[in-house]
Amino acid sequence: ENNLFLGDIISQVNNIRIDDIFEKNKKYIIAANDAKKMKIFTNFDYFFNSSKDTISITIERENKSFNNIIKRYYRKELDQTNNETVDEKIKWKKLEDNIGYVNMKNSNVQDVDDIFENLKNTKAIIFDIRNYPNYFGKEIVEKFGRSKKVSAKMILADLDYPGKFYWKDVTYGTEKEISPYRGKIVILVNENSQSRSEWTAMQLQT
């Protein structure tokens, strides 16, 4: 109906470049970096805000650029079903070439023994934290036998001395390496990897 196809690149809206629209409005979005601001901006369809029923867009398709008028819709009129066939219930699995994969959102601390037993002889393990993971990075590090290392530094208040603060090292791992995992550790992150995801990434890097 609107002559839009998967793979089309929308470069302008009402003759204004996408980058310019974002730069003008990003100051109104609360986020730590531009990547997250762009995600929020896109998710809420700010690029297509208008008081009219239609907008003009510039499309790049197959190395050609052309203008198109598209209709605007209410959200309730749109089919926003995600048709991807990704099994979001996967906790862990073995990939080709003897590589392990762990989804940190679908797995939890009760799965650590099972994960280690099945993936301990793999060449590498991919920990996917492009999500909001469950809190068991500590148990993963300990189970994989890594010796204790500093993962983060925290500033804490000295309650016996008002106004005084001190540094505290946050360490994860075992007192000594016990049959440590010998393969490579790969951590998958993206703009969704925030808060607990960031903390989990620091834990796994120890």
Provide a role label for each language-model segment.
Residues 1-20, 109:
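PDZ/PDZ-like domain segments forming the peptide/carboxylate-binding groove
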Residues 12-58:
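PDZ domains, with a preference for the canonical peptide-binding region formed by the helix
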Residues 49-54, 58-206:
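Cleft-lining beta-strand/loop regions that shape enzyme active-site pockets
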Residues 1-3, 32-34, 99:
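Short, structured coil/loop segments at alpha-helix boundaries
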